[in-house]
UniProtKB/Swiss-Prot annotation:
Organism this protein belongs to: Sulfolobus acidocaldarius (strain ATCC 33909 / DSM 639 / JCM 8929 / NBRC 15157 / NCIMB 11770)
The entry's keywords: Cytoplasm, DNA-binding, Endonuclease, Hydrolase, Nuclease
Lineage, top ranks: Archaea, Thermoproteota, Thermoprotei, Sulfolobales, Sulfolobaceae
UniProt superkingdom: Archaea
Summary of the function given for this chain in its UniProt record: Cleaves both 3' and 5' ssDNA extremities of branched DNA structures.
Gene: nucS
Cellular compartments annotated: Cytoplasm
GO cellular component terms attached to this protein's record: cytoplasm
EC number: 3.1.-.-
Protein name: Endonuclease NucS
């Protein structure tokens, strides 16, 4: 559920804010920002976006950059008032004692929204892909058995090694983005290392895509490629990871 108040006068804006308890609020306005606490600062009058969250967080954004112009953390006490013809939002902390005052001279709009927390999954990292393959080895091929992750070699750390159904060593290099020539070369160095120490090794590059040049080099070097996006959706990578007995890790 959400509400929008367009170009209100300051009294209308004050009533709207006071009625929007436990809502996520955004205010687009011409405002000044005053801060006092461990230091003091002032941001001059300018159009800015203020975000007020139900947990007491306050964030004020300008026209550029990811970082806010100023902010207060969760737990701040929020108060609204009209003082000297200006709509004032005060966000105050007791420990440490800090006060952030946002002086809204003209309000262009205010929104009030009900926002509820949902589950959060970070997907797409190489670690997520390795975890998934450990628990779903047939995604690589039938009979594949993972035996060691983050295996150290003189040429770098191999993401995952295992055995195929014929007992051959399988070296897996994971990439979370489209694989390049560099990824193929890295995998080839690993394979050459294992062959030098007497292993009959296969190399498989696991990635959501691969460049044409990288694929051509891969074939010439007799390496293999598994497109992980064809095997599973992004949401699948975020499923819970189970313990795999006897899996070694450096």
């Amino acid at each position: 559920m959400f509400k929008v108040l367009l170009e209100p006068d300051l009294q209308e804006a004050l009533i709207f804010l006071n009625e929007s308890v436990n809502a996520l609020l955004t205010i687009y306005s011409e405002c000044e920002i005053l801060y006092s606490g461990r230091a003091k600062s002032r941001a001059s009058l300018s159009p800015r976006l203020t975000i007020i969250k139900p947990d007491g967080s306050v964030i004020i954004h300008g026209p550029t950059k990811r970082e806010p112009v100023n902010w207060q953390p969760p737990g701040s006490r929020i108060e609204y008032s009209i003082e000297s013809g200006v709509l004032t939002v005060n966000a105050e902390r007791k420990r440490p004692k800090e006060r952030l005052s946002i002086l809204h001279h003209r309000v262009y709009y205010i929104t009030s929204s009900e926002v509820k927390p949902g589950e959060f999954f970070l997907v797409g990292r190489e670690k997520d892909e390795v975890d998934f393959i450990i628990n779903n080895p047939d995604v690589i091929e039938g009979g594949f058995k993972p035996i060691h992750r983050e295996y150290r070699t003189p040429y770098g750390t191999v993401d995952l090694i295992g055995k195929d159904k014929e007992g051959n060593l399988v070296v897996l290099e994971f990439k979370r983005a489209k694989a390049s020539l560099q990824a193929v070369s890295q995998l080839y160095r690993y394979i050459m290392y294992f062959k030098e120490i007497g292993e009959n090794a296969r190399g498989i590059l696991v990635a959501p895509g691969i460049s044409e040049n990288a694929l051509n080099l891969l074939k010439r070097l007799e390496l293999e490629y598994v497109n992980i996006s064809d095997k599973l959706g992004d949401s699948t990578i975020s499923r819970p990871i189970n313990y795999v007995p006897n899996l070694q890790r450096d």
